[in-house]
Amino acid sequence: MSVDVLWAGWRMGYIKKASAKGRVLGPCLFCAKARLKPGKRNLVVARTPRVLAMLNLYPYNVGHMMIATRRHTPSLADLTRDEALEVTEWLGRVEAALTREYEPHGFNIGINLGRVAGAGVLGHLHWHVVPRWDGDTNFMPVTANTKVLPESLDRTYERVVGALAAVDRRFGTRARR
C-alpha cells in the first residue's frame, strides 16, 4: 500500500520560528480574535459566549475554517461540558454551511495538541474544518511553494456568513455576526 503525502511548504518556516522562541508567535491569536466583533477584516465569522468561528488566514483549501473556544485552554480535558457541546455543535454547523455553499466531496476536521503535533497556536484549543474535493491537490505547493485558491478570502467570508445564516434555523440559535 502506498502512502500519499500532504505537504505545506510554508508551514516548516512558521514552526521553526515558533520553536526557536519556545512559545507562540506573539499574543494568543484566538484570545485576541475573541475580543473583536465579527468582520471581514479580522476573518471572524461568528462568536458566542463560548465559541469563536473564523476563516483561516493561510487556508489549505477554500472554506478552511477554525472553531476555537473563547476561553484560553490547552487541553480537551479542561473543557467544560457546555464548551464541549457547543464546539461540537459548531463543527456540525460549519460542516452544514460549507456543504450547502461549496458542495465538497468530504472534510478533514481535526485538532493538533502541542507543538510536536503540528499546532501553530500553542495553548489554545482550536479545530480545523477543511473542505475537500476529488483532485484538490496539484503540483503548485510542491514545485512553487504556492497554494492556488479559486476565490479571495473576502468572497469566502461573504459566502460562509450567508451559508451560516441559512443553516441557523436548523440549529435553533444565532451567533453574533
Which sequence ranges carry the predicted segments?
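HIT superfamily nucleotide-processing domains
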Residues: M1-R177
